[in-house]
């Protein structure tokens, strides 16, 4: 019912941002001609609305994987249908490009979680998976920001600011049946800037 509100940004400046991030991931720097992206030019982008491009196959895949993880996890029986719908089922987070992230992240992280934890405590499962994610050595950078990055790009680069880290965490947790969301400080009393993090 909310699909008409959701969209992905498109445009050549977004392609340039991805190139700059890929360069930064390798060398901690990027081409000087891309420095204009520090003040990301949203005005040059257009919105591609989900309702016009999303396929039934995409939605079915998302629904099937969502129900699969809800049913197969030991803590799934403690997750209400309402919480499932809000914190596991969604096919997107914000304005990121649509990808088959739920299937891809499931096959990437479900074996990891299975090797780390076999119990029924969702908080302990989250802790084990979060500790594993820390070992991936995420590279923090907040010079280049723009629309939300795709789940696949985050998995490939493991690079970005706290928004990207929270998005990655949300994809990872939801893909294995852990109900997760993102909370926000519009202004942190500690850092005096906005901050986001995952909640379970």
Regions found by a protein language model. Give the residues of each.
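N-terminal accessory/pre-domain segments preceding catalytic cores
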Residues: 1-131, 135, 175
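Mature, folded catalytic cores of secreted/periplasmic enzymes
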Residues: 48, 53-56, 60, 138-139, ...
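Hydrophobic/aromatic-rich core segments of domains that either
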Residues: 111, 115-120, 125-132, 141-152, ...
